[in-house]
Design a protein with these regions (language model features):
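Soluble "head" domains of membrane/secretory-pathway proteins
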Residues: 6-142
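Aromatic-capped interface at the extracytoplasmic side
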Residues: 1-5
Length: 142
């Protein structure tokens, strides 16, 4: 992964994802997912981001705060507030998800993509575990 998920996942970390997770359960807000980047027509580019918006929800970003359906989202994994930007509004279509990196000021994520939403069939795994570096082995799905 790139630096977009720091400090949760650092550049150079290695993770294990489960392809089976989403065979039995729908993706949930807060999951860290591996998915096909929606702006890559070849479908070969994989991204790792956190699921923020679920199907049918609205996502607003105002004064560095993320709101889901008008309610502020509690994000204890964020290391620093987002740099101020113009307010943003997104309406997540059914069958799609809105993804953001934890390192918001250095993340190329759904806020800036041409195709803002990731279709459920583009999500290939839920990140469960960091196995490298060995000194930082840990579960990431808690």
């Amino acid at each position: 992964p790139s630096g977009s998920m720091e400090n949760t996942i650092m550049t150079g970390d290695r993770v294990i994802g489960s392809r089976l997770s989403y065979k039995f359960h729908e993706p949930e807000r807060g999951d860290i997912a591996i998915f096909h980047f929606p702006d890559d027509p070849t479908g070969k580019t994989l991204y790792v981001k956190r699921i923020i918006g679920l199907p049918g929800e609205t996502v607003d970003i105002v004064d560095s705060q993320v709101y889901i359906n008008g309610e502020p989202l509690d994000e204890p994994y964020i290391r620093e507030p987002m740099d101020p930007e113009e307010p943003m509004h997104f309406e997540v279509p059914e069958g799609c998800y809105f993804m953001m990196g934890d390192n918001r000021n250095y993340s190329s994520d759904a806020r800036y993509w041409q195709n803002h939403y990731v279709a459920e069939d583009q999500i290939i795994a839920k990140v469960l575990f960091r196995y490298y570096p060995f000194s930082k082995i840990s579960w990431l799905d808690e």
